[in-house]
From Swiss-Prot:
PANTHER family: LARGE-CONDUCTANCE MECHANOSENSITIVE CHANNEL, MECHANOSENSITIVE CHANNEL MSCL. This is Large-conductance mechanosensitive channel. GO terms for molecular function: mechanosensitive monoatomic ion channel activity. Belongs to the MscL family. The gene is mscL. It comes from the Bacteria.
Amino acid sequence: MSFISEFKEFAMRGNVIDMAVGVVIGGAFGKIVSSLVGDIIMPVVGVVTGGVNFTDLKLTLKEAAEGAPAVTINYGSFIQTMVDFLIIAFCIFCVIKALNTLKNKLPKEEEAAPAEPEIPADIALLTEIRDLLKK
């Protein structure tokens, strides 16, 4: 089997395609949440906290010099990213909780009792002989 045909077989499996769709949708969802946080939630939080723009919050370690930018720790961007993460984690939690609730409400299939294995002929014959000797 050639390398190309093996790759084609691998890529066309259902699980790989499902995973690819999930990654694309997850990326789009992440962009939506980032926009929600950056454009809607954080400005409101900034107004509530006295007009603070979180993306401008930073700690300057070294001032800018000729030809070199300032060295800063941008903790405001980190706060915004943490809010993104919390919203995404909460949404995923809600989806999983809803799926588990639906899964628990569906009637469970009763497991069939395992069939007794067929007794080999020699064992059946020995059992018969034992029973006859007991009489």
